[in-house]
Amino acid sequence: MDYRKESLRLHGEWKGKIEVNARAKVNDKDSLSLAYTPGVAQPCLAIKDDYKKSWELTRRWNMVAVITDGTAVLGLGDIGPEAGMPVMEGKCVLFKEFGDVDAFPLCVRTKDVDEFVETVYNISGSFGGINLEDISAPRCFEIEEKLKAKCDIPIFHDDQHGTAVVVSAALINATKLTGKKLSDCKAVINGSGAAGIAIAKLLMTLGLRDVILCDRTGAIYEGREKLNPSKEAIAKVTNREMTKGTLAEAVKGSDIFIGVSAPGVLTEEVIKTMNSDPVVLAMANPTPEIMPDEAKAAGAKIVGTGRSDFPNQINNVVAFPGIFRGALDVRASQITENMKIAAAYAIASLVDDDKLSVDYILPYAFDERIKDTVAKAVADAAVKDGVARI
């Protein structure tokens, strides 16, 4: 099937992938008066007296805004907010189908950080959570931090944290097969944007011994010239041996390669310089940093990609719906590091030890256990962290 042509045809047929359905049925005078005026005044007054009632008397408790400025849409780059709408609608479909979360797409026409933050903050009272999507780095870091400081609902940039959670789940299981502990492993992440930095942070929280991030220039280390603020910050807590040079030099002697970068940047020769039984997660789409057959021929024990036509797909859809489901269920005020870690372990747990193999380290996207398992783990972590409000 030519997915591009067929998708374009179907989008024209669908004329939008989501729609609004009424939960309150209005079919006579009484039902009209209850759903709208005059009856609707009573819940309005109740919320006026206590804004927290908005979670009980409206759909806010289950509503998430999926918000972009269109500056980093898929691999298409800065294509503008309107052009990002098909992706935002698609994300909303995934929220509903995989997490039973009602999500609404919002494409904001500004590249100014403060203007974007103010816009999102001003509408946040309508939602139980905010999912930031396809916002360019390093602006995405500043936007998320400012919104987290202003809002009393979860702010979650899925390109960062959803990816980090799934990669962490993959490595929790991969290390079972390699017989190595994360605390003994060194990883190299090629790509130091939103996903790469978030992956590094979460893996270090999980106990990874060390990680080297690389960009187009090569290894990132403290004191390297011309680093943006986000790279400067991550350089202070990574690459403890101050490795310098190219990607190939950084990868030598490592146990794990994680690619969130560009096609074909990793070669068989470079993989051969890694430690025994290396793990290669080559997630560039649609063409990975190295093809799975090439990586395995070079000695990789486990290979994952971002594609569904190869084993071990690293797909955020196994993470973000359940994470938000759990956060919404306990009316969490934020999504903490412990909630992300709980999600990673929950996802990993869905691959039974007797079924775990080099070609099966993550549950499949359509595994019906994912939503409830991840949601419960996240909700329990929220309670332990004191951010649950029910």
Residue spans for each PLM region:
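N-terminal ligand-binding/catalytic initiation module
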Residues: 1-155, 375, 381, 385-389
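Glycine-rich phosphate/diphosphate-binding loop of Rossmann-like nucleotide-binding domains
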Residues: 74, 79-99, 151, 157, ...
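Adenosine-phosphate binding glycine-rich loop
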Residues: 158-159, 282-390
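Rossmann-like adenosine-cofactor binding region
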Residues: 232-302, 307-309
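Short, ordered loop/turn segments at secondary-structure junctions
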Residues: 69-71, 79, 108-109, 134-137, ...
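General beta-strand structural signal in soluble alpha/beta enzymes
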Residues: 105, 131-134, 155-158, 189, ...
